């Protein structure tokens, strides 16, 4: 085994773990009368001293033999080893030092040494820090974080670049145990963090607003479980990781102080790599298949008109819903229009009705939309997060709870066209007929 960088298979002697500027002794599985300490694998801090880390790599080897008149006089030999930072498939847990040599930082970062933190602390007052020379896919990540103020400290994993990664972040608050968005997971794709498209991955959590919190993340394929502090069952269950990448780097983001990070590659606690079943799988009322237009800029204050819908020859493509009936425009286009203007795109589908009738429709969207049936406007509304009174339930996120309206249908084929505009984070649409009897939705 290899725990915290200490080789635990040594016979009858203590291994001295050399990490940055502190050292801790580790007992071996066997007892030697010349080496004090219990016969189990546990760290015992006997001495602290300055020692530079000059060698890296797997079991870098013996660096130096150290003998002390007092603390070490009963020890025959103490051999100094370095931890192995690169994570290989099937490797044992690795402790990550919070030292400048291991992290690439942006903005305001401090590396600190305090009693009781053998591997140091990293304080991110703002910005973030990327762990060097690490590629992470599946496994367990554990760390402690002491939050600073009311920011959103967290960890990004499977980071491909600045625009694509998975993100878990905290929203410490005095009412955090009851605050629905205290802990959140969201993917970032094409440079857009999609927190407002996945409200099902935001939850209450037993976080301490002031003080240390222990976070344990288990990642397996398309799933993730998150445990907070002493929780024995997951605080947050992510049935499907929604990012576009399956492996990549690790990044911590502030504000917060981080310590005691341990990565256990491929340790997934039996968590299946397959995504959980879509809760709306088999729902025959979801409008799942659409045609999507190209995007254009829509000046603020202007409404979309039916006669502005792009012609059939102007680059339409088919698109199907993701989980929960979400049409994810951000995954297609990112945030294509800079500045104050909104990006607008059109979606259209055909609903065939057995007779002339009306149907109740549940609809979710971000941020503004206009719905036309056979060329006539039947519904328009806004779901603006930045204007609190204009937020639709649940709290400005995209959900079928956002709104409802009556859909008028003629006998035969009916064209349903939706113009949807956005300039704030996730860009998406959900449409569901409460009762699909007597209608036929477009097939894939």
PLM region descriptions:
Residues 208-237, 368-378:
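Carbohydrate-binding surfaces in secreted/extracellular proteins
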Residues 110-127, 139:
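Short carbohydrate-recognition loop motifs
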Residues 242-280, 399-408, 415, 431, ...:
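Ligand-recognition surfaces built from glycine- and aromatic
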Residues 191-214:
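Short, aromatic/His-centered strand-loop micro-motif at the edge of beta-sheets
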Residues 126-190, 296:
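Secretory/extracellular carbohydrate-interaction modules
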Residues 262-354, 424-428, 433-444:
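Extracellular/secretory pathway-exposed regions associated with glycan biology
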Residues 358-372, 416:
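Aromatic-lined ligand-binding clefts that engage carbohydrates, nucleic acids, or primary amines
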Residues 229-247, 378-391:
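Short, solvent-exposed beta-strand-to-loop segments that form ligand-recognition rims
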